Each structure stands twice: as structure tokens, then as C-alpha cells.
């Protein structure tokens, strides 16, 4: 037992009157209640959104894709010849819609193909480049926002948690976006008196062949200060998934053991009821026991969850890379395709099974040490082109086109209620580099957190914009001169889910960058986020 000093005893005694008065009040709920509620006035019409997030693993340069400048010398930042000379796989089954052969050579021949998106915040024209051609169609492009980001973390191991959570390593509230979303929707269920839902609201889908697997697994399921029931379910895509399914059947457990555990839980729950709360529905006072109680309830429901997961698309096919500087094309297990199909399946299920948030890691077809976009010294054009094309091609085949309805639309993403978020941990040098210095002998790019891009498509976004700007200066001076932080972006994405980003478990208003941190209060901060990222 810890003994109080006289000073501590007096301090505690000064608080006792308030505490006693509180305990004498009628019983109140210690549950999550309406956690995450957005104040009125932030949205004219609150969005009813779900999020599919894709993390491009390894750090991807935006210059051939999301931030393509059409001016000579700026198009691909040193890789015009390699991009123009790429061989594109002619097989429609492998690389649907890819160019039929090498792209047009750079000037004096016709320029590399691209599509205007919008002017950035410095008034410069930004195009979607050849590697992002799957985003060119009007029903996609007109609902696309490119956000220029910047931070100062060079290692993957530090940058990935920062970008995925919006907080740096060491912060006790560092949590997956899915944790906040799951806590919010479980709070709404509880407020409505609905039974505990078997299926999670938030998932992470992590290919087994992705590099840094343990780091990704822990980050995608990071709980921070949220309730234990808010933890996203992270599933590995690959052979381990079938092992997980078999474990959900709880082999070896007996009904009598379950009954005993259920009885013991009920007894302990009764001991923890609030003063005067006799109704069975009254929540327990202990947050830790409450988390345990919900976990045990989910454990009992595991076999029914196994039945649901057995319907999840699980087929992993061997695919071929779409682009190659030198033939033959790379081949490999297309776990990204499998993960994306599973994600869309989870997001399009009817209630009460449909997910609200699914995060997918893009493990690529053309991989280097399991990090598909980590193109140090070699293969920038091949690996970035092949991997991004594979991801965007698979994704866009599962997005509805309002002008061309199909019988399969019920199982496709509807951009009116789905926000697609494409992120990466940092960018890559805006020049051919060796050891982060310009080098004409290199055919790759090194880490560059000074300027990179995230993309959001659909949801509350109705017009194309480029937020931020990357300088046109050469080499080491090509940094983001107007930029946002991963914290800004994560707060905005919670807002798109109609979740208060400034709940204590989420972000502090003052931790955001200047355009938002200076807001007079939380409501004004949310309005500023909405106006910048979604209006």
C-alpha cells in the first residue's frame, strides 16, 4: 500500500467534499456515450462516410504520378528518358489500360502524357502523370485532392508510425485512425441501445510479404488512449489468414468452460455497478473491466465471425509487373490485389457487417526487400510504375462510374459515401541520387521527407484541388514551400468521418500547423480543417 505524506493527505482532503458530493448524485453512465460528437455548424450536412486507406510502402516519389509538372525539366525530375522508354505489358489481363508500348519520348518529340488536375497553392499547374493514368477519368479526377506534406523523419521505422497515426513515436496517444473510428461507431451503437456488434468497424489488411511486417502490424492496430474495444482488427493477407480463421473456431473450448467464464464475468460486473444502479444494462465503473468484458463477449462470438471471414476474398494470384525498363517483366504474388479486394468486400457489406475503415498496405508486385517503392539507386521507373499501376488499376476496377452503371455496382465503392486515402511515409529525391546527393549514374531516388504527396478521392470532396506546393527549384532546393503535416491530414480524415479530431484521445488543436492551430476553439479548428481539405 502506498502511504500518503501529510501534504498529499491535505491535498486529497481538499478534494474530498467534491468527490463525496459526486458519489451522492444519481447514478450516471461511465460508458463512452456520444464520444466523438461533432458540434453543430461544422458541416452543413454531416457526412456519412467510410474510408479505404492505401499505404504505398517504402516512400514514393510523386513526380511521375500525383504531382507532375508539365514544364520542360520538371516533368519527372530527372527520369524523363526512363519513363518515356518504359516497356508496358501488352496483356490486358495483367495491365488493363496501360500504354501499348513505350511512351512518347521527351521533347523535341511529343511530351510525356499527363492530365491537368488543378493549380497548386502557388498557382502552378499540376498534372496527374503517366503512372496515375487510372485517376484521369473525370468521375475520379473531379473528386481528387492532392495534399503536399512535409516532415523531418528519414528512417522508415520513424516515418511510418508518424504518417499512419499523425503522431510521432513516444506519444502515449499515438493510435491508428481506425481506433478513433471504431470507438465512435461503438459509442453510437451503445447510445442507440444496439447489441454488441460481432464484426469490427475498423480493419487493417497487411500482406505477409510486406517488409517491416512487425512494425506495420503493431502500428495498424495501435490503440493509444482509446478504449480496448476500439482496437482495429489487423489481418495478415497470405497463408496465415487460414490459420487465423481456424483459431476463431476456438478448438478445444467447451460450452461448460464458456458458461463458467460467463458466470464469473456477471458476478464481477455486478460488484462494479454504479451506486444505486440496479438495471442489468448499467455499465461497470471500471474501464479496464469494461474492455475485458467486451473482449470476452467478442471471444464468444468468434465462431460466427469465422463464418463471415470465410466469405472474404482470399485468392492470391501470381501477377506480372506492368512496366519494365528492361525485359522481362517482373512476376510475383499479387498480395496487394488480394488485400484490396478483401477491403472493398468489407466496406460494401450491408449492416451489421459493413466496415467503416479499412487500411491496406501496398506490398507491390516488383519488390525490393519487401518495400516496393524503396527505389534506392536502381529501378525507380520500373518499380514505381509497375507497383502504382497495379494498385490503381485494381482499385479503380472496384469503383463505380455513375455514367456507366453495371450489375456489379452493389459490390463496388461508391465515391459519394467512400473516401479513398492514398498515403506513403515520405517522398523520394527530386533528382537521380546516390546517398541523397545528385548523381547522374543512379537510376533511383533516396528518401525525401521534404516534399511528398497524399491523395484523397471522393467522400466529402466534390472538386479537384492541389493543397500545398513543391518548389520548382533544382536538386536539394526542391522542397515543399507550402505544406501540411501528417497530423493535419489525420485530423481532417477523422473530420470526414464525422468524428471530433480534438477529443482527448485524438489530437491537440495546438499540435496542428499554423493555419489550424491558431483557431479560437475546437469548433473553429474543425471548420478551418473542413474549409481547407474538403470545401
Identify the residue ranges that each predicted region occupies.
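Ligand-binding pockets and gating/stacking loops
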Residues: 2-535
Amino acid at each position: 500500500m502506498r502511504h500518503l505524506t501529510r501534504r498529499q493527505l491535505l491535498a486529497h482532503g481538499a478534494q474530498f467534499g467534491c468527490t463525496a458530493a459526486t458519489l451522492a448524485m444519481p447514478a450516471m453512465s461511465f460508458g463512452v456515450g456520444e464520444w466523438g460528437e461533432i458540434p453543430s455548424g461544422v458541416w452543413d450536412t454531416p457526412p456519412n462516410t467510410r474510408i479505404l486507406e492505401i499505404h504505398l510502402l517504402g516512400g514514393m516519389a510523386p513526380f511521375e504520378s500525383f504531382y507532375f509538372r508539365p514544364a520542360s525539366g520538371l516533368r519527372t525530375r530527372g527520369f524523363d528518358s526512363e519513363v518515356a522508354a518504359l516497356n508496358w505489358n501488352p496483356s490486358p489481363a495483367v495491365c488493363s489500360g496501360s500504354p501499348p508500348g513505350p511512351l512518347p519520348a521527351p521533347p523535341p518529340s511529343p511530351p510525356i502524357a499527363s492530365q491537368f488536375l488543378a493549380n497548386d497553392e502557388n498557382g502552378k499547374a499540376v498534372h496527374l502523370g503517366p503512372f496515375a493514368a487510372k485517376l484521369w477519368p473525370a468521375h475520379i479526377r473531379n473528386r481528387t485532392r492532392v495534399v503536399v506534406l512535409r516532415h523531418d523523419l528519414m528512417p522508415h521505422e520513424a516515418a511510418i508510425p508518424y504518417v499512419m497515426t499523425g503522431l510521432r513515436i513516444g506519444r502515449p496517444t499515438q493510435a491508428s485512425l481506425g481506433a478513433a473510428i471504431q470507438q465512435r461507431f461503438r459509442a453510437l451503437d451503445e447510445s442507440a441501445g444496439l447489441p454488441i456488434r460481432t464484426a469490427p468497424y475498423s480493419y487493417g489488411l497487411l500482406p505477409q510479404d510486406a517488409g517491416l511486417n512487425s512494425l506495420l502490424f503493431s502500428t495498424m492496430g495501435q490503440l493509444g488512449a482509446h478504449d480496448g474495444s476500439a482496437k482495429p482488427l489487423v489481418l495478415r493477407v497470405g497463408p496465415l489468414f487460414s490459420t487465423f480463421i481456424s483459431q476463431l473456431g476456438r478448438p478445444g473450448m467447451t460450452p461448460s468452460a464458456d458458461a463458467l467464464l460467463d458466470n464469473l464475468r456477471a458476478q464481477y460486473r455486478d460488484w462494479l455497478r454504479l451506486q444505486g444502479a440496479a438495471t442489468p444494462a448499467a455499465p461497470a465503473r471500471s474501464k479496464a473491466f469494461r474492455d475485458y468484458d467486451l473482449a470476452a463477449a467478442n471471444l464468444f462470438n468468434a465462431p460466427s465471425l469465422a463464418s463471415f471471414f470465410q466469405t472474404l476474398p482470399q485468392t492470391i494470384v501470381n501477377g506480372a509487373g506492368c512496366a519494365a525498363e528492361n525485359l522481362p517483366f517482373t512476376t510475383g504474388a499479387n498480395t496487394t490485389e488480394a488485400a484490396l479486394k478483401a477491403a472493398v468486400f468489407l466496406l460494401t457489406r450491408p449492416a451489421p457487417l459493413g466496415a467503416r475503415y479499412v487500411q491496406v498496405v501496398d506490398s507491390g508486385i516488383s519488390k525490393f526487400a519487401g518495400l516496393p517503392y524503396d527505389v534506392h539507386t536502381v529501378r525507380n521507373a520500373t518499380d514505381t510504375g509497375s507497383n502504382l499501376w497495379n494498385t490503381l488499376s485494381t482499385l479503380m476496377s472496384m469503383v463505380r462510374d455513375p455514367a456507366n452503371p453495371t450489375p456489379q455496382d452493389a459490390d463496388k465503392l461508391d465515391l459519394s459515401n467512400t473516401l479513398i486515402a492514398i498515403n506513403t511515409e515520405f517522398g523520394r529525391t527530386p533528382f537521380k541520387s546516390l546517398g541523397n546527393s545528385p548523381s547522374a549514374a543512379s537510376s533511383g531516388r533516396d528518401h525525401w521527407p521534404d516534399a511528398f504527396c497524399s491523395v484523397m478521392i471522393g467522400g466529402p470532396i466534390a472538386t479537384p484541388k492541389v493543397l500545398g506546393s513543391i518548389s520548382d527549384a533544382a536538386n536539394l532546393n526542391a522542397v515543399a514551400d507550402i505544406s501540411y503535416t501528417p497530423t493535419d491530414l489525420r485530423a481532417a480524415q477523422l473530420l470526414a468521418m464525422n468524428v471530433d479530431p480534438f477529443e482527448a484521445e485524438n489530437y491537440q488543436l495546438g499540435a496542428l500547423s499554423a493555419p489550424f492551430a491558431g483557431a479560437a476553439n475546437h469548433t473553429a479548428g474543425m471548420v478551418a480543417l473542413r474549409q481547407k481539405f474538403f470545401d
